Amino acid sequence: MKLTCMVIVAVLLLTACQLITADDSRGTQKHRSLRSTTKVSKATDCIEAGNYCGPTVMKICCGFCSPYSKICMNYPKN
């Protein structure tokens, strides 16, 4: 019984600490614009059509990688 009560108190205490910490850190992100620009540049960094896209290449194709020729291809336009 004592152990159960201690576990319940510990869980409540840890939950309260998490909630207090979350409230204190709201809106305090530094260099917000720098971080978002970096994410965008990483997301758009891709291999153009006609270039090799095999397993040794670290970037992804802007379109899709042909499974047979391992060449980046553009998506067909309808």
Swiss-Prot record:
Tissue-specific expression: Expressed by the venom duct.
Propeptide segments, given as residue ranges: 23-42
InterPro entries: Conotoxin, Conotoxin_omega-typ_CS
Assigned keywords, A-Z: Calcium channel impairing toxin, Disulfide bond, Ion channel impairing toxin, Knottin, Neurotoxin, Presynaptic neurotoxin, Secreted, Signal, Toxin, Voltage-gated calcium channel impairing toxin
Endoplasmic reticulum in keyword set: no
Localization of this protein: Secreted
Superkingdom of source: Eukaryota
Disulfide bond sites: 46-62, 53-65, 61-72
Signal sequence residues: 1-22
Cellular component terms (Gene Ontology): extracellular region; host cell presynaptic membrane
Gene Ontology MF terms in the entry: calcium channel regulator activity; ion channel inhibitor activity; toxin activity
PROSITE patterns linked to this entry: OMEGA_CONOTOXIN (PS60004)
A Pfam family hit: Conotoxin
Domain notes: The presence of a 'disulfide through disulfide knot' structurally defines this protein as a knottin.
Family: Belongs to the conotoxin O1 superfamily.
Function: Omega-conotoxins act at presynaptic membranes, they bind and block voltage-gated calcium channels (Cav).
Name listed for the protein in its UniProt record: Omega-conotoxin-like SO-4
Lineage summary: Eukaryota, Metazoa, Spiralia, Lophotrochozoa, Mollusca
